Design a protein with these regions (language model features):
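Short alpha-helix capping/helix-loop boundary micro-motifs
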Residues: 135-146
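Loop/turn positions that initiate beta-strands
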Residues: 151-154
Length: 178
């Protein structure tokens, strides 16, 4: 009903939103019939405007990855001592962040760029996150975690940061990090 009554307005809204987020080349479908293809590719193959493709898909048509990150913002966030590194990836999601987020931070921002020390990266990815969720509070949890301390739970992995690699990509999003 909305498409019939307000289709032109919806198309214009979608056009502005997509163009304001780096365009249809910056949207990669992660599920549905167009999984692994960009919105621009699908629209070109169908010889129609990308907004028409989106309208036909509807609000529940597919998940997608949006390439809109601004590296300046990422660097500013990494420099903030209160920022944690986390991921909303999951095994059911066709996105490499489900398997490669933390390896990528280690590889890129610790080893290659030197934006973080390995200690700070681990704190942002584990210890600070535990504190934010009060997993270090003995009044909240039976066995605290978030630090390597006697009596606390800890899942420890010894690794060489220079050997860590994120192997997942959009073609193979479930590839484990090395």
């Amino acid at each position: 009903a909305v498409v019939r009554e307000r289709g032109a307005e919806l198309a214009e809204h979608l056009r502005r939103r997509v163009e304001g987020r780096n365009g249809p080349d910056a949207i990669l479908f992660g599920s549905g019939e167009f999984s692994g293809r960009t919105l621009a590719d699908v629209a070109a193959a169908q010889d129609r405007p990308f907004e028409d493709v989106l309208i036909e898909l509807g609000p529940d048509g597919a998940s997608a990855a949006y390439f809109v990150m601004d590296e300046r913002v990422v660097w500013a966030l990494l420099a903030d001592p209160h920022t944690v590194v986390s991921s909303d990836g999951s095994p059911s999601m066709l996105h490499p962040r489900g398997y490669g987020s933390f390896a990528r931070v280690t590889r890129r921002y610790v080893v290659e760029e030197g934006a973080l020390s390995i200690e700070e990266a681990v704190r942002k990815m584990a210890g600070q996150t535990a504190r934010n969720y009060r997993m270090d509070d003995v009044d909240v949890v039976d066995v605290p975690r978030g630090q390597v301390r006697e009596g606390w739970a800890a899942d420890l992995v010894a690794f060489d940061p220079a050997e860590v690699r994120d192997a997942a990509d959009f073609e193979n999003p479930h590839r484990l990090a090395e």
